[in-house]
Amino acid sequence: VESYGAELYSSALTAVNDYGRRLSLAALGEVAGGIYSAEDFLDDDGFGGEGLALRVSIEISEAGISYDFTESSDQVRGNLNCPESVAAAAAYYCHCCLLPVGAPLCAGLFKDLKILTRKPSIVNPAFPAAVAAGNVETSMRLVDLVFRALAKALPHRIPAASQGTMNNVAMGAAGANGLSWDYYETLAGGAGAGPHRPGRSAVHTHMTNTLNTPAESLEYHYPLRLTRFAIRRGSGGLGLHAGGEGLIREIEFLEEAQVSLLTERRRFAPWGLDGGGDGEVGYNWLNGEKIAAKADIFAVAGDRLLIETPGGGGWGTPPD
């Protein structure tokens, strides 16, 4: 503003937004108009609610695009409730994936995009609903849900489902030396395969973008030992293009700790597309015994927590 003045600055913003809007409408113009719907299910909310439905109907027309989530499940007792703003962010992300590379991220891209929700529901809860996992888990599944619907309109552009969870692992304790500690990480998994490529293995996808914690840093700063960190072979869905593989991460506790797990895709598998196979669901283990997708546990020295993250869905009928 100091360099060019308020008037020129304002006109430049208007020009960028107008350009973004034209790009968005042009991209939508390449899609056959109509209504495209999809359904998927969250495993559970940790309080007995299971098979929680996520549903979307996407209407595409010359006037723009709308994402209707109103048929999704009611809000739940657990923290999978997803604020409307987070649901909108998931839809915006998917919308941007339809645009040309280099499209400017601006309000104009979303000028003709509408988000429809129902309150109270799992996609627009009422206060004081718990929402922590709505941001890290439900948002991931909304992305795959939207892609599943869009695949009906754009079958040769949309990938199969990715792992669909951030595999949240949190732990901590007062500490044997009197110093409290806490540690939180999200774990990568398999990416869904697409029409032109296999899915990548052991990567973060869609709504998560964290890096893995190096073993050296983990063991230096915390009373933990990383005993296994590997690709989970065979977890990606079969297909003309195979889904990406998940990973295996095993941590040994050197002193007692409280552990919280917030994970998904332990029951409903990442789906394949166009004849591709589903990816494998994930598993959580403590000392060889399976534990729930959402769990609070107390570990003692010598205990081992092992997480197997989901693979991605395959794309296309597998070759003979």
Feature locations, PLM:
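Glycine/proline-enriched, intrinsically flexible loops and inter-domain linkers
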Residues: 1-320
